[in-house]
Amino acid sequence: DPELTTAQSKYVESLARAGASVRWVELADPDKAVAVALECAGLLLPGGGDIEPSLFGQERIPSCGEPNPLRDTAEPKLLHAFLAADKPILGICRGIQVLNAFLGGELYQDIKPLEHVPHNDHWAKIHTVTVRRGTLLAEILKQDTVLVNSQHHQAASRVAPGLEIAALSEDGFIEALEKPDAKFCLGVQWHPEWLSEADPRQQALFDAFVNACH
């Protein structure tokens, strides 16, 4: 096991409360990563840096962060492998962007000029999202609005075919996407792992993911 950062340990703790153990997958060899990951019951796509814009059909703008070629190469393979195997997928922050970008959607490379509520550098709860009724997310959270933290400067723009919007921020940015025809495929733009210890509604996301893995 790698020596975990505080951010990584939050995922482990949230999943452990739901009754799951975590296996970290080395991405240096993407095909090997897929083979190893498919031994697991589900895939969590965690937060991280920006995605290379050319991978979703755009030219990089100056405010786009440095991409992570390792993750940009391996994560789409992992995503498609788990969808093909009909295994549960939970995407968090960068993870929701991976879902959208690599299933044929597009991203805002920088939402800063467009935002009306704070979206970056807030690990504590900072803004409200509205959950769409009838979605998997609504079934999990069991409420129409939820107060979330926010730690991103990119967001889904054009939604990928097959994905549906499950939640929006107060200023209209996509905060959750899901794939209704999958066993369990849900992405959220916030970081529930930083809130789940104190907030049962945020822990419910991990509980539902782990339940789907059984």
Where are these regions (language model features)?
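N-terminal beta1-alpha1 cap of cysteine-dependent amidohydrolase-like domains
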Residues: 1-92, 101-102, 112-141, 145-147, ...
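Active-site-proximal beta-strand elements of phosphoester/diester hydrolases
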Residues: 186-189
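Active-site helix of classical SDR
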Residues: 95
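Post-Walker A helix-loop "phosphate-sensing" segment adjacent to the P-loop in P-loop NTPases
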Residues: 104-108
